[in-house]
């Protein structure tokens, strides 16, 4: 008993080395076991500072050893990780959209640094122990809890000690760039900038970031929503740190999990997937949830060794401010680097060339991904700067939440902060006649300075259209006469006839078999004759209603138009089966589709409206 106690005491005080272990981030062949000790935060008078009643503290300190030397890790909660209007969306088995909007305040995601080290940084989640990475004496170390009986044991290791999951390095899928040679980029002289350009460059910028997790990734983590959300939070927390040096703040405004099947055809052709995701963002996502940039996370393997793709210089574009990223590693840090790389393309950066350098040996925009990447190269910084001055994207000047402000508000920095009614820049630059640039207050008798329902500094009259109806199932939105904002999008009730009685409204759309055939096969494709749909009742055909545990379930006779979608194309068979796909919903009749008189498809059954 005494001997066991002495061993436990030694382990708590002196770290020990390990040769090989399987951790959450992968197989590690050399690591150090440490026991981080929490250090109470003291005020100047030596009295412990009281903090509000929360599960996770705003600031924390931990002491442990690295290579035998003591270090103190300072952590500060990333209060701006979530936008004030952050939402989470997933889908019920019957296709219903389920969105929750409770604010995430008491979370466990931190940024930090090592005490007494100028060039130090840390990205840590403290949900169950300490997990993440920190920079110490110029090297990147990773830390995560060990699954031992002693819950305080942690492993510390370097990225070179993580065994590669595959021999082939992961690369970016971008092949077209905006540079023409491999010559080093010459820095533009600051003297060529106007004062207005300098103020724009220096203004803090914000990206309201929306993440979509596809159905393949959802199933990879066996449908455990809490596991997926925590994984995404860790990635975005790391992403935030990487963009701090560019004066950008990434705020997560929404997380959507396609739990009931993919909303687009996610395929191994990464360019096709990117194009479809961009169209989905423009046509489906933006009408219901504003965001500046969106990324699709998928566990689908793209062709070759590609792990992601993003449009170059496209931020704020409704269709092209997007990227797709493969969840290609157990390590959230590794996937976060891929996310940062693809977002870099949206922000005007190309893949680095041989002449590009950064403080570390490997830069974020390198064509190959490494776990210790944390800096943008000189090329990336210059390309990004030139893109900002050339395109002047405006969506990044809108701060996601007034309540999230940590620093005092600054009048004249182009975004409205606590206590301000407007902000149009400095008095010299302001071109908004509704706003007093000196005070950041509205001019006398002005009611507003911007918004869909603001015109000549006054609210538009009640009844003025501010958003046109998109289709038969959408209502036009009208100004109230009391606000500059356009009211939230509203839809016709589900079940209302649409498109000359070809369909019934469903969540703001009018799904019909003909439209779905055109989407699947291209213009000119039409719904097959009703006889073809009887194949969904025939065990020997490609028809079915759904699959359960890999077993094909046929439709009942009354439900045949709610199973497999059959279309006819020019010069083709009349009963044309969709091509095979790993996505269980690909080529299936969409929920809400008309399947009879006053009947629609719901959960693969034809039911009354």
From Swiss-Prot:
<protein>
    <recommendedName>
        <fullName>Snake venom metalloproteinase-disintegrin-like mocarhagin</fullName>
        <ecNumber>3.4.24.-</ecNumber>
    </recommendedName>
</protein>
<comment type="function">
    <text>Anionic amino acid sequences containing sulfated tyrosines are needed for cleavages. Inhibits the thrombin-induced platelet aggregation, and the thrombin-induced release of ATP and ADP. Has lectin activity (inhibited by heparin).</text>
</comment>
<dbReference type="InterPro" id="IPR001590">
    <property type="entry name" value="Peptidase_M12B"/>
</dbReference>
<feature type="binding site">
    <location>
        <position position="395"/>
    </location>
    <ligand>
        <name>Ca(2+) 1</name>
    </ligand>
</feature>
<feature type="binding site">
    <location>
        <position position="292"/>
    </location>
    <ligand>
        <name>Ca(2+) 1</name>
    </ligand>
</feature>
<feature type="disulfide bond">
    <location>
        <begin position="466"/>
        <end position="486"/>
    </location>
</feature>
<feature type="disulfide bond">
    <location>
        <begin position="453"/>
        <end position="479"/>
    </location>
</feature>
<feature type="binding site">
    <location>
        <position position="410"/>
    </location>
    <ligand>
        <name>Ca(2+) 2</name>
    </ligand>
</feature>
<dbReference type="InterPro" id="IPR002870">
    <property type="entry name" value="Peptidase_M12B_N"/>
</dbReference>
<dbReference type="InterPro" id="IPR034027">
    <property type="entry name" value="Reprolysin_adamalysin"/>
</dbReference>
<dbReference type="InterPro" id="IPR006586">
    <property type="entry name" value="ADAM_Cys-rich"/>
</dbReference>
<keyword id="KW-0865">Zymogen</keyword>
<feature type="disulfide bond">
    <location>
        <begin position="424"/>
        <end position="430"/>
    </location>
</feature>
<keyword id="KW-0479">Metal-binding</keyword>
<keyword id="KW-0964">Secreted</keyword>
<keyword id="KW-0732">Signal</keyword>
<feature type="disulfide bond">
    <location>
        <begin position="545"/>
        <end position="555"/>
    </location>
</feature>
<keyword id="KW-0106">Calcium</keyword>
<feature type="binding site">
    <location>
        <position position="398"/>
    </location>
    <ligand>
        <name>Ca(2+) 1</name>
    </ligand>
</feature>
<feature type="disulfide bond">
    <location>
        <begin position="498"/>
        <end position="510"/>
    </location>
</feature>
<feature type="binding site">
    <location>
        <position position="413"/>
    </location>
    <ligand>
        <name>Ca(2+) 2</name>
    </ligand>
</feature>
<feature type="disulfide bond">
    <location>
        <begin position="434"/>
        <end position="457"/>
    </location>
</feature>
<feature type="glycosylation site" description="N-linked (GlcNAc...) asparagine">
    <location>
        <position position="507"/>
    </location>
</feature>
<feature type="disulfide bond">
    <location>
        <begin position="562"/>
        <end position="601"/>
    </location>
</feature>
<feature type="binding site">
    <location>
        <position position="345"/>
    </location>
    <ligand>
        <name>Zn(2+)</name>
    </ligand>
</feature>
<dbReference type="Pfam" id="PF00200">
    <property type="entry name" value="Disintegrin"/>
</dbReference>
<keyword id="KW-1015">Disulfide bond</keyword>
<feature type="domain" description="Disintegrin">
    <location>
        <begin position="408"/>
        <end position="494"/>
    </location>
</feature>
<dbReference type="GO" id="GO:0090729">
    <property type="term" value="F:toxin activity"/>
</dbReference>
<feature type="disulfide bond">
    <location>
        <begin position="517"/>
        <end position="567"/>
    </location>
</feature>
<feature type="disulfide bond">
    <location>
        <begin position="595"/>
        <end position="606"/>
    </location>
</feature>
<dbReference type="GO" id="GO:0005886">
    <property type="term" value="C:plasma membrane"/>
</dbReference>
<dbReference type="GO" id="GO:0008233">
    <property type="term" value="F:peptidase activity"/>
</dbReference>
<feature type="disulfide bond">
    <location>
        <begin position="358"/>
        <end position="363"/>
    </location>
</feature>
<keyword id="KW-0482">Metalloprotease</keyword>
<comment type="similarity">
    <text>Belongs to the venom metalloproteinase (M12B) family. P-III subfamily. P-IIIa sub-subfamily.</text>
</comment>
<keyword id="KW-0800">Toxin</keyword>
<feature type="signal peptide">
    <location>
        <begin position="1"/>
        <end position="20"/>
    </location>
</feature>
<feature type="disulfide bond">
    <location>
        <begin position="356"/>
        <end position="379"/>
    </location>
</feature>
<dbReference type="GO" id="GO:0008270">
    <property type="term" value="F:zinc ion binding"/>
</dbReference>
<dbReference type="Pfam" id="PF08516">
    <property type="entry name" value="ADAM_CR"/>
</dbReference>
<feature type="binding site">
    <location>
        <position position="341"/>
    </location>
    <ligand>
        <name>Zn(2+)</name>
    </ligand>
</feature>
């Amino acid at each position: 008993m005494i001997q066991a106690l002495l061993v436990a005491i030694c382990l708590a005080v002196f770290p020990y080395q390990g040769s090989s272990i399987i951790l959450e981030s992968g197989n590690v062949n050399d690591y150090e076991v440490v026991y981080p000790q929490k250090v109470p935060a003291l005020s100047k008078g030596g009295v412990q500072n009281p903090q509000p009643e929360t599960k996770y503290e705003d600031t924390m300190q931990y002491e442990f050893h690295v290579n035998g030397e003591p270090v103190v890790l300072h952590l500060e909660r990333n209060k701006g990780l979530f936008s004030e209007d952050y939402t989470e969306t997933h889908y019920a088995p019957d296709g219903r959209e389920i969105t929750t909007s409770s604010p995430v305040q008491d979370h466990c995601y931190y940024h930090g640094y090592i005490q007494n080290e100028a060039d130090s940084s840390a990205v840590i989640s403290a949900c169950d122990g300490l997990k993440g990475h920190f920079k110490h004496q110029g090297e990147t170390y990773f830390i995560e809890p060990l699954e031992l009986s002693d819950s305080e044991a942690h492993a510390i290791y370097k990225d070179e000690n993580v065994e590669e999951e595959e021999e082939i390095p992961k690369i970016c899928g971008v092949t077209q760039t905006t540079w023409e040679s491999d010559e080093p980029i010459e820095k533009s002289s600051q003297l060529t900038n106007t004062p207005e350009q300098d103020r724009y460059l220096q203004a803090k910028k914000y990206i309201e970031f929306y993440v979509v997790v596809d159905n393949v990734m959802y199933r990879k983590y066996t449908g455990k929503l809490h596991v997926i959300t925590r994984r995404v939070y860790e990635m975005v927390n790391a992403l935030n740190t990487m963009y701090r040096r560019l004066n950008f703040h990434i705020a997560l405004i929404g997380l959507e999990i396609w739990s009931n099947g993919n909303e687009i055809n996610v395929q191994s052709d990464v360019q096709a997937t990117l194009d479809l995701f961009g169209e989905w963002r423009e046509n489906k996502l933006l009408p219901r949830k504003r965001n500046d940039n969106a990324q699709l996370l998928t566990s689908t393997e793209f062709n070759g060794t590609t792990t992601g793709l993003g449009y170059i210089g496209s931020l704020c574009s409704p269709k092209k401010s997007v990227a797709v990223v493969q969840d290609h590693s157990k390590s959230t840090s590794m996937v976060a680097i891929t996310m940062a790389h693809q977002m870099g393309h949206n922000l005007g950066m190309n893949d680095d060339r041989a002449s590009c350098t950064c403080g570390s040996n490997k830069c974020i925009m390198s064509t190959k991904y490494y776990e210790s990447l944390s800096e943008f190269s000189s090329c990336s910084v210059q390309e990004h700067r030139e893109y900002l001055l050339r395109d002047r994207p405006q969506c990044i000047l809108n701060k996601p939440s007034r309540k999230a402000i940590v620093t005092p508000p600054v009048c004249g920095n182009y975004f409205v902060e606590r206590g301000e009614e407007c902000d149009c820049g400095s008095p010299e630059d302001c071109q908004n006649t509704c706003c007093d640039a000196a005070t950041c207050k509205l001019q006398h008798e002005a009611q507003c300075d911007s918004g869909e329902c603001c015109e000549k500094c006054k609210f538009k009259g009640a009844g003025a259209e501010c958003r046109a109806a998109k289709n038969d199932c959408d209502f036009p939105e009208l100004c109230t006469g009391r606000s500059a904002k356009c009211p939230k999008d509203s839809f016709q009730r589900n079940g209302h006839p649409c498109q000359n009685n070809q369909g019934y409204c469903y969540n703001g759309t009018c799904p019909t078999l003909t439209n779905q055939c055109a989407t699947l096969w291209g213009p000119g494709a039409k719904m097959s004759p009703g006889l073809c749909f009887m194949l969904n009742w025939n065990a020997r055909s490609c028809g079915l209603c759904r699959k359960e545990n890999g077993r094909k379930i046929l439709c009942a006779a009354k439900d045949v138009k709610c199973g497999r979608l059959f279309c006819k194309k020019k010069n083709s068979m009349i009963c044309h089966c969709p091509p095979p796909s790993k996505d269980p919903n690909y080529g299936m009749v969409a929920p809400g589709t008309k399947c009879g008189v006053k009947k629609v498809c719901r959960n693969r059954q034809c039911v009354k409206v």
